[in-house]
């Protein structure tokens, strides 16, 4: 069975500093991997390489066995990063139909409207994003990321700075995705939300993979357990 | 061992320059229309040929870097381009001196001189661009792409006197002893170019070794 | 055909965003009109016909720079560039879409500048109108391709604001020179002669080569 997301001996340098070292990781289809680590551990760097924004300095990554930059692969991947990745000068509806077109979504107008409904923005569909509140922008970002029905989801600290409504929307959307056998890799500091969703856990410490395995009962009951056991002292 | 080759080449270049200067200054007669001043051509023309050769190599290695990702091509690109810029400056200066004496003007905006000046600006820009990017991989990638764009000007410089009417002289036939002097001097300049490139390459290799050691130190 | 659909999607998006915010386009129009007015004021009428070609293209180049420099930089707020790179969109389609949008904006500025020039300089410029329009499009495409490409090249650099003008103008010079020569000749009402055809072929060659190079290299430049 091909791994949904795999990293094979990945190294990444920023100048002299090795942001990632010897990362060997495989994520099975249908699972949800919580990527943990302190700030600067390399979570964002690794996710960016999975997403195809960066190339690994050494080693390779693959999504369903193919290169992350491959056009077909990109069609199946959904990304939610630190920025909301929607245009301030366009309306919510225009933003979603734009990405719908780029991703080749069939019947993009209907899909856009459905997603606006799901994230609770239907009533402001023609409002320009620059007028939106922060929570509204974040919910639009979620709609954008999931719009094209991706099979692999890469989320970089998705719960950070979300308001309650947006967190609820995101959790619902992620659970639905998992129910449809999507694969999720998410990095997070919000251990409780992450542990509830995760089937597997990986811990990065100073660029190295300190732990990788299934989410255990201990992790669920005490989310800080992993850091205590495997994190840096 | 690397040093030895540089010293040998250096000695050879010195000998060649002595021989060439002797021929250029003492043996060759004054030219009919220009008097003694034309002798600067024996440096002006080969300087530009050398620069053109170097820039072509740099363009190719930049392409090779983008195709293969091997840092050695980046090292060659920057070394060769730096040396080429030096020869471009020599070529420009000798040309301007000649023009001032023969035509009475330092400069004119004909196709050859304009495209040549653009060449200097472009490759100077390349060096400034490299200085502005700290990460070695990004630096290599971005400057290689820019180098390829800059290289489009080189054939323009070469063919400008064929495509447009220019103030700059057209290609002309020369008596054999002048051709010979020209080619001998070109040989000397090519060897000089090779020496400078080797020295710069060595510097670049050492820099990468230091970078590698720094990375190792950070990793521990 | 998905390629062209995506290209036009990007072009439409850029145009829509620019027409809503009007940041660059207002600056561009104002700059163009101001310079044309000032030069009309500063120089004797007879002299300005001689310098018309050069003057107009200097105006277009600098007014254009106001639009072109923002080309990829406008994707940086909200991390939109990441979303575009992650989308199944070939980098060449992204580039071409942006270049087309820029071309249309620049042609709009030129379409206003020429009549203004005609009025304030009392110049008849429509003698060779269609050839002039062709030269305007070819010349504008040439420096649009370069400006858009270099905007992509420098988008992730720390010193983007400083580097971009430094790198872009030398590359544009041959294209601008050809456009200046051709425009100056055509404004005088003369059809193109053999000497001018050299410049025309040069301009077309320039456009073809730089478009090809840009399409080939834009992917390499955007993905770190």
Segments from the language model and where they lie:
Chain A
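Conserved ABC transporter NBD signature motif
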Residues: 59-73, 211-213
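Catalytic Walker B motif of ABC-type/P-loop ATPase nucleotide-binding domains
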Residues: 153-157
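Helix-to-loop junction immediately C-terminal to a conserved catalytic motif
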Residues: 51
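Helix N-cap at the start of a conserved alpha-helix in ABC-type nucleotide-binding domains
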Residues: 164-166
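Conserved ABC ATPase "signature" region
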Residues: 97, 101-124
């Amino acid at each position: 069975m091909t791994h949904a997301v795999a990293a094979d001996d990945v190294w990444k340098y920023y100048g002299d500093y090795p942001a990632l070292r010897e990362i060997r990781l495989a994520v099975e289809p249908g699972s949800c991997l919580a990527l943990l680590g302190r700030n600067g551990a390399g979570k964002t760097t690794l996710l960016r390489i999975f997403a195809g924004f960066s190339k690994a300095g050494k080693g390779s990554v693959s999504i369903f066995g193919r290169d992350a930059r491959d056009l077909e692969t990109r069609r199946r991947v959904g990304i939610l990063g630190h920025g909301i990745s929607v245009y301030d000068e366009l309306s919510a509806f225009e933003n979603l139909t734009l990405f719908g077109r780029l991703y080749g979504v069939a019947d993009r107008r209907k899909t856009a409207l459905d997603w606006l409904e799901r994230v609770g923005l239907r009533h402001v569909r023609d409002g320009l994003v620059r007028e939106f509140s922060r929570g509204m922008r974040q919910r639009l970002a979620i709609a954008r990321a999931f719009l094209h029905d991706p099979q692999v989801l890469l989320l970089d600290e998705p719960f950070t700075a979300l308001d309650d409504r947006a967190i609820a929307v995101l959790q619902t959307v992620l659970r639905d995705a998992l129910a449809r056998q999507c694969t999720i890799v998410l990095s997070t500091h919000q251990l409780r939300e992450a542990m509830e969703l995760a089937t597997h856990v990986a811990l990065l410490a100073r660029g190295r993979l300190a732990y990788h395995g299934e989410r255990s009962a201990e992790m669920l009951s005490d989310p800080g357990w992993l850091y205590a056991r495997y994190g840096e002292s | 061992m690397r040093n030895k080759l540089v010293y040998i080449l250096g000695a050879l270049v010195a000998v060649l320059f002595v021989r060439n200067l002797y021929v250029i200054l003492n043996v060759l007669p004054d030219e009919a229309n220009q008097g003694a001043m034309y002798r600067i051509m024996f440096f002006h023309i080969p300087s530009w040929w050398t620069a053109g050769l170097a820039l072509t190599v740099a363009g190719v290695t930049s392409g090779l870097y983008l195709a293969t990702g091997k840092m050695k091509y980046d090292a060659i690109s920057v070394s060769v381009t730096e040396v080429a810029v030096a020869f471009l400056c020599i070529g420009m200066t000798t040309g301007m001196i000649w023009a001032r004496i023969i035509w009475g003007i330092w400069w004119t905006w004909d196709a050859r001189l304009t495209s040549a000046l653009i060449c200097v600006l472009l490759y100077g820009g390349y060096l400034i661009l490299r200085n502005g990017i700290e990460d070695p991989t990004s630096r290599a990638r971005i400057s290689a792409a820019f180098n390829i764009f800059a290289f489009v000007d080189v054939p323009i410089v070469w063919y400008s006197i064929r495509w447009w009417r220019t103030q700059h002289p057209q290609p002309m036939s020369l008596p054999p002893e002048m051709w010979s002097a020209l080619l001998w001097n070109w040989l000397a300049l090519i060897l000089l170019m090779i020496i400078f490139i080797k020295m710069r390459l060595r510097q670049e290799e050492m820099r990468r070794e230091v970078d590698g050691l720094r990375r190792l130190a950070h990793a521990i | 055909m998905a390629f062209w659909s995506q290209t036009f999607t990007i072009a439409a998006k850029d145009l829509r965003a620019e027409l809503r915010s009007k940041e660059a386009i207002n600056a561009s129009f104002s700059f163009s009109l101001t310079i044309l007015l000032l030069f009309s004021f500063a120089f004797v009428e007879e002299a300005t016909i001689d310098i018309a070609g050069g003057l107009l293209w200097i105006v277009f180049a600098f007014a254009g720079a106001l639009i072109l420099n923002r080309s990829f930089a406008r994707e940086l707020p909200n991390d939109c560039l990441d979303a575009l790179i992650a989308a199944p969109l070939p980098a060449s389609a992204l580039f071409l879409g942006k270049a087309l949008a820029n071309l249309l904006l620049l042609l709009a500025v030129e379409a206003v500048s020429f009549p203004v020039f005609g009025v304030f300089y009392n110049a008849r410029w429509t003698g060779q109108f269609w050839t002039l329009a062709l030269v305007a499009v070819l010349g504008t495409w040439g420096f649009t391709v370069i400006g858009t490409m270099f905007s992509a090249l420098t988008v992730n650099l720390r010193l983007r604001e400083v580097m971009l003008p430094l790198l872009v103008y030398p590359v544009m010079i041959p294209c601008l020179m050809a456009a200046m020569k051709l425009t100056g000749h055509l404004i005088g009402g003369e059809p193109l002669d053999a000497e001018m055809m050299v410049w025309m072929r040069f301009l077309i060659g320039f456009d073809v080569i730089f478009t090809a190079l840009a399409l080939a290299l834009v992917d390499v430049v955007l993905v770190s």
